[in-house]
Amino acid sequence: MKPGIHPEYAVITANCTCGNVIKVNSTAGKDLHLDVCGACHPFYTGTQKVVDTGGRIDKFNKRFGMLGKK
């Protein structure tokens, strides 16, 4: 490898909304804020998280629902 062309790695902390703190190496050099991590992601925990998108679906059906019917 050529000397002097590679970025420097710094240890940063990635803070999750669940409170989990992860130390990682990064070239960005700033701390990160995560929405989900391995400790709280539904795939890894085995729990379902309900996302309320009913308002969007109702709004879409109200606008375009009659177009598909004959």
UniProtKB/Swiss-Prot annotation:
Its cofactor is Zn(2+). The keyword Signal does not apply. The keyword Metal-binding applies. Keywords: Metal-binding, Ribonucleoprotein, Ribosomal protein, RNA-binding, rRNA-binding, Zinc. One of its GO terms (molecular function) is metal ion binding. It holds the Pfam family Ribosomal_L31. GO terms for cellular component: ribonucleoprotein complex; ribosome. Disulfide bonds: none annotated. Binds 1 zinc ion per subunit. One of its GO terms (biological process) is translation. It comes from the Bacteria. Gene3D superfamilies: Ribosomal protein L31. Zn(2+) binds at C16, C18, C37, C40. SUPFAM superfamilies: L28p-like. Binds the 23S rRNA. Belongs to the bacterial ribosomal protein bL31 family. Type A subfamily. Part of the 50S ribosomal subunit. This is Large ribosomal subunit protein bL31. It comes from Shewanella sp. (strain ANA-3).
